[in-house]
Amino acid sequence: MFYKIAQKVMFQMDPERAHNLAIGSLKMTGNSPLNAFYAQNIAPAPVSFMGLTFPNPVGLAAGMDKDGESIDAFHAMGFGHVEVGTVTPRPQPGNDLPRLFRLKPAKAIINRMGFNNKGVDNLVKNLIAKKTDIMVGVNIGKNKDTPVEQGKDDYLICMDKVYPYAAYIAVNISSPNTPGLRSLQYGDLLDELLSALKTKQLELAEKHKKYVPIALKIAPDLTTEEIENIAQSLIKNKFDGAIATNTTLTRDGVSGLANANESGGLSGKPLTELSTKVIKQLATGLNGQIPIIGVGGINSAEDALAKFDAGATMVQIYSGFIYQGPKLIKEIVEAYRLK
């Protein structure tokens, strides 16, 4: 009930202003009695993933809490993990406003945020400051002004700094809103990046005496052959996990709606079938050797179950969470427990 009232107010506001207000409010209330307005008890449904044990298989996707400011509040809601970021080595403002658009009839969102964040050093401070022991993945990317050919260096900088504080690290090469970024998903550029990250991971594991898994987040706008090539590269470089998928550049299911022609990545219900299809193809290519987090268009427990059936071990929500509220977490966990 509280979420429906809050949502009604928020949906009257500019989307980015509403987002910033929500994150600020959650930051202030995460460890206070006021978190009773959104906290919920969810019975454990433990799941093993990348050598880690999560309390349940439902996580918050990257992009909601870019700077890790409201981690404790999301823990109170019952998420099994939170993925913060995308974070870059240096702070950057992102793309020009407006850059976030609701397509309410389709339960969808278009964004062209452009990795706006306060930088990796600020994120590390927030990771240290969190009060709860929730599993936190850190999604890392490159700065907009770093040439793609040197992008590897940005990922290594971020990895080095977040490694001691992350449950796992997600490598984002699939956002459509950073020029040239998606080119890292192909051929020699991909192999070179994954190899460098794996080498760095093993160095950091020795240095910090703990092994932090790394996962690759991929786009939905890939051919079957491209997905197979990515799968082979992940296996070859001994990556620990994959996350499928990011937002799509297609506009299937939103034609004619207000804001449908805005540039950027489309998320939400129109992405449901495409992301599930990619998960299934990726799972085939990985052949059980590397586990997958399924994300994209999960608007109900049934959508999540389809991701599990396609080959995902865990799922993440974002747009569906905005449209449905925290109850979606509980619904998915309960359905998972019964499946």
Swiss-Prot record:
Binding-site list for substrate: 66, 111-115, 172, 177, 246-247
Localization per record: Cell membrane
Keywords: Cell membrane, Flavoprotein, FMN, Membrane, Oxidoreductase, Pyrimidine biosynthesis
InterPro entries found in the cross-reference section: Aldolase_TIM, DHO_dehydrogenase, Dihydroorotate_DH_1_2, Dihydroorotate_DH_2, Dihydroorotate_DH_cat, Dihydroorotate_DH_CS
Domain of life of the organism encoding this protein: Bacteria
Catalytic reactions on record: (S)-dihydroorotate + a quinone = orotate + a quinol
Organism, scientific name: Shewanella sp. (strain ANA-3)
Pfam families xrefs: DHO_dh
Recorded GO CC terms: cytoplasm; plasma membrane
Cofactor: how and how many bound: Binds 1 FMN per subunit.
Purpose of the protein: Catalyzes the conversion of dihydroorotate to orotate with quinone as electron acceptor.
Membrane topology per record: Peripheral membrane protein
Example GO biological process: 'de novo' pyrimidine nucleobase biosynthetic process
Protein name per Swiss-Prot or TrEMBL: Dihydroorotate dehydrogenase (quinone)
Sequence positions that bind FMN: 62-66, 86, 139, 172, 217, 245, 268, 297, 318-319
Active site: 175 (nucleophile)
Subunit structure of this chain's protein: Monomer.
GO MF annotation list: dihydroorotate dehydrogenase (quinone) activity
EC number: 1.3.5.2
This protein's pathway: Pyrimidine metabolism; UMP biosynthesis via de novo pathway; orotate from (S)-dihydroorotate (quinone route): step 1/1
Record flagged with keyword Acyltransferase: no
Enzyme superclass (EC): oxidoreductase
Cofactor requirement: FMN
Record flagged with keyword Flavoprotein: yes
Family: Belongs to the dihydroorotate dehydrogenase family. Type 2 subfamily.
